[in-house]
Amino acid sequence: MKPGKPRGTGGGKMARIHSHERQWVGALLLVGFWALAVAAPVEANPYLTKPGETRTAVKIGTCAVTGGFIHLYAAVENSLFEKYGLKAEHVFNRGSSISLAALASGENQFLYCAADATIPGMATGLDIKLVAAPLVGLPYVLITRKDIRTLEDLKGKALAVTRPGDLTYRLTKALLKKFNFGPDDVKMRPVGGSQPEQYQAMVADIVQGTVIVPPLDVRARHDGFNVIYHLNDLDLPFIYSSVHTNSQMLKEHPGIVQKVVAAMAESLYFVEKNPDKAKAALAKVLKLDDLEALQSAYNAFTKDLVNRRLTIPANAVAETVEVARENGTDVKRKPAELFENSFAENLEKSGFLKELWGGEIPGKKK
């Protein structure tokens, strides 16, 4: 008998055994791949609350009442934070200075505000950082009374601002500088409050114009007032609605920070896919039932300005700090010390964003 040739039926039996083994191995591999495929979405969203996990209470302040915060309003109203193990309380603050103070003291754990309004204050030494930027761009317009139809008509008039140094003040100052108005040509009058109060000051002719964001532009037109300038044409670096937190949260509770950022990322998707629910949340906060105005706000803040990756553009932070320095701010912190992109970057690295959007993330990187 030649070497290697099986004797009798033993070789055939062994061959059948090896064949069965290969089938079992193949089946096990198939089951393994299937299990991985099923588990992948769970792994891609590691931030969801787990069974039996106690929700963590957090306070999220806002610095104004505006259509630009539609994503936060929708997240709170539709319990998105609860999915991530958070019991979020929305706290209304008035103005960036008050809001930053509440965050720095620990009264609030998070702040949702236009970063351009907060960066100058943060740069003076406040131990606060930006951790996500859902909206990037400048949505403001200048509205004026009926007799003011052009920028030239502003001479001898007054424009409302919240308070000296605040965002409306700096935007109005940049606008007047752009068109060579001197300090005696157009006055900036602090009226406090938020955009609705500034609008009412214009209605009462205490001032003759103010910078606002949608949906107040629709109301202004309905009331016979004019929209005479879109501030996006100033070509200023501008980071709008952003998530802020303090050093204590970053050091002691980074997991909670990550969950808040994840919830806000989902809110971008939710608002885009559920316009009626988003507008209902906005209507509740703004106490507004004008469907045209609500649609105006929805269009303004859910399309061109949306930054689905939530990363903070470093160049815009640096330019905003430089503008603040030129305007007399005592800058004590470097631009890179004012933001932390790791939480937003984790969403993409983990596969969370790809799963959320069902593939490639829409839109360009900002």
Name each region found by the language model:
Residues 4-8, 13-28:
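Bacterial N-terminal signal peptides that target proteins for export
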Residues 26-38:
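Bacterial N-terminal signal peptides
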Residues 36-46:
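Bacterial Sec-dependent signal peptides at the C-terminal "C-region" and cleavage site
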Residues 44-204, 208-214, 227-237:
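Short, glycine-/small- and polar/acidic-enriched structural segments
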Residues 45-48, 241-248, 301:
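A short small-residue
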Residues 116-117, 188, 196-287:
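Pocket-lining segment of extracytoplasmic ligand-binding domains
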Residues 251-333:
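Secondary-structure end/capping motifs
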Residues 322-366:
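Conserved C-terminal helix/tail region of periplasmic/extracytoplasmic solute-binding proteins
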